[in-house]
Amino acid sequence: MSTKNAKPKKEAQRRPSRKAKVKATLGEFDLRDYRNVEVLKRFLSETGKILPRRRTGLSGKEQRILAKTIKRARILGLLPFTEKLVRK
């Protein structure tokens, strides 16, 4: 029972599982497309804020993707950061 010549055991390596990509589409529109301003404006309030999930009906992951897309469009100047305050 000598351990000098014993080969070390190889541990079984597990292949990392792939995360399923979220289908971030709204009908035929892709929510990741920051150039489609007409679709993105549907998810903004009158003052330019991003609407919450309970109003948009998107899942959590889809809402995060949408928020990132809207912010990207704002930085590129395709969407305004704010709208004028509407007083009634």
From Swiss-Prot:
Keywords: Ribonucleoprotein, Ribosomal protein, RNA-binding, rRNA-binding
Tagged with keyword rRNA-binding: yes
GO-annotated biological processes: translation
Gene Ontology MF terms: small ribosomal subunit rRNA binding; structural constituent of ribosome
InterPro entries reported for this sequence: Ribosomal_bS18 (IPR001648), Ribosomal_bS18_CS (IPR018275), Ribosomal_bS18_sf (IPR036870)
Hydrolase in keyword set: no
Cellular component, GO annotation: ribonucleoprotein complex; ribosome
Assembly description: Part of the 30S ribosomal subunit. Forms a tight heterodimer with protein bS6.
Family affiliation: Belongs to the bacterial ribosomal protein bS18 family.
Identification of the protein by name: Small ribosomal subunit protein bS18
